[in-house]
């Protein structure tokens, strides 16, 4: 089930939302059957875009760092989900080693880590933090905005196990996307559970592969509801050898962008949508970066436009050689007249909350994950009513967060498919 949270949606329920609300029993059963066959990622967050005529994920994060954006009222849901996840993986667990990323000076990130520590502590675990920084030899206090502190400690590796001094955990939880590579200290941990697995990190993971999996999931789900999968699936393309410094190196991007735009134009014509389609170009194996938005491939003939767009894709001083070309989904949602996009947060197979990412200086077709963005937590709606299939729209106080919970879980299920396909230790059968 999905918690009943407030959203920025105030207008009438559209056809897509109504269909999802009315299909709730079939949807929940379908998810139950899928989770019998597939293992959900340990935790996930999904960035969604709601165009009114279409609702789709545009990014799925397997090392979410946004738990600080959940309201305190969401904590019991997160704790219950964490307990369920731990009981499946290591029911006898008493110690959890949490390994954060290097953003130890980012107060918002530290608040997210603090929230994770709180969740797993209340789930019945002793939680301590370990650092991948080999130069750290003594415990390092990390001050928090509320006056508290986190203690980051040096890791201790012994054969097939990883821990801290006088601390031997059953499970090691990564909150680090490994964009800088896989440290040797994390390899060959055969005696412990490492979650998420190493192949969930960016050295292996590709957004293109994820959205291929999502397309498969969306087609299955759309067939269940008797609707066009395009309504919940962003069309995408991929380029594996891109050189932003060379015009010849952009030919693939031009071809893929042209193909995606042509497909979207046909869909817009089919549904009578009077908007100009666009695509976004983003790094295929990284997150937390900008994107390049294109409405016409001729924009790539302008060297200044290309250079400006390439700078937006920078990470670690280098532009990506692999890119995803994704159908742009405009956002119809506003908070205080600023463009907003919902983010759904999940632990195990459960939706534990959500929030809006808001940017007052960005348009409906632009990426909101940039400096200047703010975050608006979603609170519980008044009352605890469930969606009532068949009720007249507006008469049953429907859970308008429900459709976000559905699409978020579809993205999580796609991540499960993706991780199964890339598991280096998966058994194969001829």
Write out the residue ranges for each language-model feature.
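Short glycine- and acidic-rich boundary segments immediately preceding or forming the N-terminal edge
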Residues: 1-38, 220-230
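C-terminal active-site "lid" helix and adjoining low-complexity regulatory extension at the edge
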Residues: 2-9, 35, 63-97, 359-430
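Conserved metal-phosphate-binding beta-hairpin within the catalytic cores
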Residues: 38-67, 282, 328, 340-349, ...
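Short, flexible loop/turn elements at secondary-structure junctions
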Residues: 47-52, 62-64, 102, 154-156, ...
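Phosphate-binding site of ATP-dependent enzymes
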Residues: 49, 54, 262-265, 271-277, ...
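Conserved N-proximal alpha/beta basic substrate-recognition cap immediately N-terminal to
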Residues: 80-81, 104-121, 126-276
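Conserved hydrophobic helix-helix packing surfaces used for dimerization/oligomerization
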Residues: 95-98, 172, 279
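Glycine-rich phosphate-binding loop of ATP-grasp-fold ATP-dependent ligases
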Residues: 237-252, 278-305
């Amino acid at each position: 089930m999905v918690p009943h949270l407030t959203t920025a949606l105030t207008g009438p329920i559209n056809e897509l939302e109504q269909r999802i609300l009315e299909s709730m029993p079939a949807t929940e059963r379908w998810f139950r059957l899928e989770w019998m066959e597939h293992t959900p990622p340990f935790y996930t967050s999904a960035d969604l875009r709601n165009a009114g005529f279409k609702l789709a994920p545009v990014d799925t994060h397997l090392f979410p760092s946004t738990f600080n954006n959940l309201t305190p009222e969401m904590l019991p849901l997160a704790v219950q989900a964490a307990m369920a996840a731990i009981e499946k993986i290591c029911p006898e667990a008493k110690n959890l080693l949490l390994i954060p990323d290097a953003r130890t000076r980012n107060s918002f990130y530290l608040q997210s880590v603090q929230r994770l520590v709180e969740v797993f502590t209340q789930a019945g675990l002793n939680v301590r933090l370990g650092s991948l920084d080999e130069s750290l030899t003594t415990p390092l206090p990390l001050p928090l905005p509320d006056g508290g502190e986190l203690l980051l400690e040096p890791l201790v590796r012994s054969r097939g196990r990883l821990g801290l001094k006088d601390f031997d955990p059953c499970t090691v939880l990564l909150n680090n996307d490994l964009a800088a590579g896989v440290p040797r200290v994390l390899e060959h941990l055969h005696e412990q559970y490492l979650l998420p697995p190493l192949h969930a990190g960016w050295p292996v993971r590709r957004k293109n592969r994820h959205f291929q999996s999502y397309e498969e999931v969306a087609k299955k789900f759309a067939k269940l509801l008797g609707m066009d999968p395009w309504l919940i699936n962003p069309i995408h393309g991929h380029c594996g050898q891109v050189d932003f410094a060379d015009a010849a190196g952009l030919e693939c991007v031009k071809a893929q962008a042209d193909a995606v735009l042509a497909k979207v134009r046909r869909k817009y014509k089919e549904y009578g949508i009077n908007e100009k389609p666009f695509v976004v170009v983003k790094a295929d194996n990284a997150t937390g970066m900008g994107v390049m938005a294109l409405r016409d491939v001729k924009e790539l003939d302008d060297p200044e436009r290309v250079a400006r767009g390439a700078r937006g894709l920078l990470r670690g001083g280098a532009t990506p050689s692999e890119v995803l070309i994704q159908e742009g989904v405009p956002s119809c949602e506003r908070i205080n007249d600023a463009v907003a996009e919902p983010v759904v947060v999940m632990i195990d197979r459960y939706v534990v909350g959500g929030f809006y990412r808001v940017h007052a200086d960005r348009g409906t077709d632009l990426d909101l994950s940039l400096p200047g963005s703010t975050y608006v937590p979603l609170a519980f709606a008044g009352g605890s009513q469930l969606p009532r299939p068949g009720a007249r729209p507006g008469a049953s106080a429907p859970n308008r967060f429900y459709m976000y919970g559905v699409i978020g879980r579809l993205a999580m299920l796609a991540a499960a498919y993706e991780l199964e396909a890339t598991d280096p230790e998966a058994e194969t059968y001829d």
